[in-house]
Amino acid sequence: MSTGVREVTVEGGWPALELVTAGARVQLIPELGCDIGSFVDARTGVDVLWRVPWGIPPRSTGPFSAATETEWGERFPGGWNVLLPNGGAATPAPGGTTWGFHGEAALLPWTVLGSGVDGERAWAELEVRLIRAPLRLHRRLELVDSALAVTETLTNLSSVPIEVMWSQHPSFGAPLIAAGTRIETGATVTETDDTLTDGDLAAGERSTWPHAPAQGGSAVDLSVVPDFATHRLVYLSEFETGWARLVNDDLGLAARLEWDASVYPSAWLWQELNDTPGHPWWQMAYVCAIEPGTTYPGQGLAVAKEKGGTPLLLAGGEQRVVTVGLSTEAP
């Protein structure tokens, strides 16, 4: 397939951009938070990203800040989102406002600045200006063969220093994710979320990769997707280099995620494996997300700070740049 960029319409009636090379096909939805809705590996025909069970919501505008996880879920399509200026529960923000669940960037419409082809490279550039925070986020996506590079430039437009949570939320689904799928990473430390009340992991416990303490006191091996229903939230840290890989030997396919650990020193490992019986998953979600970011735990900025998390501090006018890569390859 020749390299190109084209305009398409995806589920829900949303206009989308499709970047195509000989190695992959990537779709993004500018009006829905610049969500990267699919990444199809050309060799196997597998879409490595996950979509929510209810599908992409109908095309609409707003709300752009979710007071609760339920409101967020009504406009959450799955795929790969960017979370800014908050991650997790809604949190008090400067000026007496609130930053909603997972922030604004994944809900606001983004402006397409340009797209095109440069040799074997398909590219697109987009940006968004947040409403409840004086921030602009610019995103350049470049697809070469089966490797997507997403470079984000975050700018504090004000003269006032501001603390934020900034993270990527790529979520992976079946058939890449299956019982026995292997998880490899450069992390050396694991810490389970301290609000876990069920599932198979003990809450608020540290260990060394690939282990995490189980509720019964034994050790769980996080490097293999289990063959039973459960849900997990674990924070990975102390990266030698910022990378993780999901490997399905039966498919002969791996997805590799890479990032700059000096900007994103931690990553959230979230799994919902047909477990939660009520809203929002109803035992219908089978997903594994590896989410590099600035800060944990994923409980909102104020709570994260109370629990020792380190937000990203942007001075007035400061810019920060990070590149996150997603590629597919043979194991």
Residue spans for each PLM region:
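Surface-exposed acidic/polar loop and edge beta-strand patches at domain peripheries
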Residues: 1-149, 160-163, 170-331
